[in-house]
């Protein structure tokens, strides 16, 4: 990366350097969609953002707790039949939707991907015990401020307004509702997320990646069992 003039760049690292990259041989994992595993291809938590300027990466302990709480609060809202939005709403209550728990391995793989500063889904992120789903969100501003990660999670929640519970999951418009459906997928038990803040062309970006296991969004299944 070449930067003209004299620039003092301080990169703040808020994530613990987890041992999973060394403890697990991700290069042996074969994902259903094919491709090289993210943690094998990139190999570490070192940012690889090209001409983008890294401001900070990783999540604090409090941010992890807040993201997990936001997911579980929303899941319980839907499960209790309190989500009135939809196309049409309300969303039916669920009888098999449990709270998620944080998984550090999912978080590690999510952080490796976030550290590439490439908005979008990676190809292969599965872990040994299950297939892994993924939600991504990116916000940008010309002001030197970065969105709270919980607000990025709420962007996924807002997709519920386009979900039609009277249709099968596969009959809904996945592009409009896929983040919401992964959030409330009943068979998903664990979550782990990574975060990257960077600047490019005077814009300030916050990129959030959350990985979910077991993965949701299978076309022949339903989000959850209704009461």
Swiss-Prot record:
Tissue expression notes: Expressed by the venom gland.
Keywords of this entry: Allergen, Disulfide bond, Secreted, Signal
Disulphide bridges, residue numbers: 27-40, 31-124, 49-117, 193-210
GO CC term, one of those recorded: extracellular region
Pfam families in UniProt: CAP
The UniProt record lists the keyword Secreted: yes
Signal sequence, renumbered to the chain: 1-23
InterPro entries linked to this entry: Allrgn_V5/Tpx1_CS, CAP_dom, CAP_sf, CRISP-related, V5_allergen-like
CDD domains in the record: CAP_euk
Annotated localization: Secreted
Location of the SCP domain: 68-212
Family classification: Belongs to the CRISP family. Venom allergen 5-like subfamily.
PANTHER family tied to this protein: CYSTEINE-RICH SECRETORY PROTEIN-RELATED
Protein name in the entry: Venom allergen 5
Species this chain originates from: Vespula maculifrons
């Amino acid at each position: 990366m070449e930067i003209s003039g004299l620039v003092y760049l301080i990169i703040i690292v808020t994530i613990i350097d987890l041992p999973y990259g060394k403890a697990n041989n991700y290069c042996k994992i074969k994902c259903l969609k094919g491709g090289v595993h993210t943690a094998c291809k990139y190999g570490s938590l070192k940012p690889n953002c090209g001409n983008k300027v890294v401001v900070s990466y990783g999540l604090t302990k409090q941010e992890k707790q807040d993201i997990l709480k936001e997911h579980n609060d929303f899941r319980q809202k839907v499960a209790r039949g309190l989500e009135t939005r939809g196309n049409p709403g309300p969303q039916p209550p669920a009888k098999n939707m449990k709270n998620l728990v944080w998984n550090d391995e999912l978080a590690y793989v999510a952080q490796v991907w976030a550290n590439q500063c490439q908005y979008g889904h990676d190809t292969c992120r599965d872990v040994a015990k299950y297939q892994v789903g993924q939600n991504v969100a990116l916000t940008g501003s010309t002001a030197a401020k970065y969105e709270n990660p919980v607000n990025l999670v709420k962007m996924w929640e807002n997709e519920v307004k386009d979900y039609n519970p009277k249709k099968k999951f596969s009959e809904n418009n996945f592009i409009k509702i896929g983040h919401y459906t992964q959030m409330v997928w009943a068979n998903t038990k664990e979550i782990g997320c990574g975060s990257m803040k960077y600047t490019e062309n005077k814009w300030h970006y916050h990129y959030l990646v959350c990985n979910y296991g077991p993965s949701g969004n299978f076309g022949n299944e339903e989000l959850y069992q209704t009461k």
